[in-house]
């Protein structure tokens, strides 16, 4: 189950929802059909990829998906195995989410970054045409050190 921590004095899950982020826990090997059909249109529901994200090498923690970015698509991703860490930009500061097997991440337009803590297998789905990728655009936000845990 996703472990979420963030700036004190706010309802972090409510703030995540306001910026387009939601997590649910659904043990199994894929996101629940009800979630997929709620978020993606019929022609977008196919699995785009199954990937294993490896922890970054020392000094590369802020490169690629480890850089603050916004994806051009709406994402519905399922974690099959492993642990990883995400951070999301909220108006009150960054919040940290540690994710593991069974977590479903739904993101639409939120600024975030991702770091696998161990090899982590993902089932990737997102909006857009069949040939579309995530359309990641780095935001240039300062790459502060990653927290040790959520």
For each of these PLM feature ranges, what is it?
Residues 54-61, 71, 78-80, 88:
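Long, positively charged binding patches that form subdomain-scale interaction surfaces
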Residues 1-68:
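A short, N-terminal "cap"/entry segment at the start of jelly-roll beta-barrel domains
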Residues 117-150:
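Double-stranded beta-helix
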Residues 76-101:
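A short beta-strand-loop-beta hairpin characteristic of the jelly-roll/cupin
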Residues 85-87, 113, 123:
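General beta-strand recognition
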Residues 68-71, 116:
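Residue-level marker of regulatory loop/turn positions in helix-turn-helix DNA-binding domains and
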Residues 73, 83, 111:
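Extracellular structured ligand-interaction cores
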Residues 99-119, 127-128:
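Conserved metal-binding segment of the jelly-roll/cupin
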């Amino acid at each position: 189950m996703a472990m979420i921590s963030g700036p004190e004095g706010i309802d972090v899950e409510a703030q995540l929802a306001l910026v387009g982020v939601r997590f649910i826990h659904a043990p199994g090997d894929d996101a629940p059909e009800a979630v997929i059909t709620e978020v993606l249109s019929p022609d977008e529901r196919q699995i785009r990829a199954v990937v294993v994200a490896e922890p970054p090498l020392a000094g590369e923690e802020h490169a690629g998906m480890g850089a603050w970015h916004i994806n051009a698509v709406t994402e519905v991703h399922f974690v099959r195995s492993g642990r990883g860490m995400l951070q999301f930009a909220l108006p009150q500061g960054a919040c940290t989410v540690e994710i593991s097997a069974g977590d479903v991440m739904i993101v639409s337009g939120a600024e975030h970054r991702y770091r696998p803590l161990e090899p982590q297998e993902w089932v990737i789905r997102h909006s857009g045409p069949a040939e579309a990728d995530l359309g990641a655009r780095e935001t240039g936000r300062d790459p502060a050190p990653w927290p040790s845990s959520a």
